[in-house]
Amino acid sequence: MLDNGFSFPVRVYYEDTDAGGVVYHARYLHFFERARTEYLRTLNFTQQTLLEEQQLAFVVKTLAIDYCVAAKLDDLLMVETEVSEVKGATILFEQRLMRNTLMLSKATVKVACVDLGKMKPVAFPKEVKAAFHHLK
């Protein structure tokens, strides 16, 4: 666990790779998404609960990813996730995919809270904002 975030282990499976045993570029997004989802669980809420109880969803608003070094078949990796900014309807996540101390990829992901009935951004519920603000 990071001081201001969360670490999540990921194993690279055959299904994640191309014919050369290198992780296909889109799979990195899966790794980052899983880590954000598990991070939310550690803060005692899930996207499913927000959806069912409040008709709210977290959606990716912007995403920037930098591929530095290739991940390969059977690598055991760690996704490090930190919150760098919390605003009314958005949270900015900084994520790194690591093999030991080597950074393989990094991503900046801005996630927005959307009211699914209106399909418009809305402020995060108080309990969600409080969970992230205590980390700052």
From Swiss-Prot:
Entry keyword set: Hydrolase
InterPro entries per the UniProt record, alphabetical: 4-hydroxybenzoyl-CoA_TE, HB-CoA_thioesterase_AS, HotDog_dom_sf, Tol-Pal_acyl-CoA_thioesterase, YbgC/YbaW
EC number: 3.1.2.-
Enzyme class: hydrolase
SUPFAM superfamilies xref list: Thioesterase/thiol ester dehydrase-isomerase (SSF54637)
MF terms (GO), sorted A to Z: fatty acyl-CoA hydrolase activity
UniProt superkingdom: Bacteria
CDD domains per record: 4HBT (cd00586)
First and last residue of the signal peptide: none
Catalytic residue list: D18
Known role: Displays acyl-CoA thioesterase activity with short chain aliphatic acyl-CoA thioesters, such as propionyl-CoA and butyryl-CoA. Enzyme activity is relatively low, suggesting that the acyl-CoA thioesters used in the assays are not the physiological substrates. Has no detectable activity with 4-hydroxybenzoyl-CoA, lauroyl-CoA (C12:0), arachidoyl-CoA (C20:0) and arachidonoyl-CoA (C20:4).
Annotated family: Belongs to the 4-hydroxybenzoyl-CoA thioesterase family.
Protein name: Acyl-CoA thioesterase YbgC
Lineage: Bacteria, Pseudomonadati, Pseudomonadota, Gammaproteobacteria, Pasteurellales
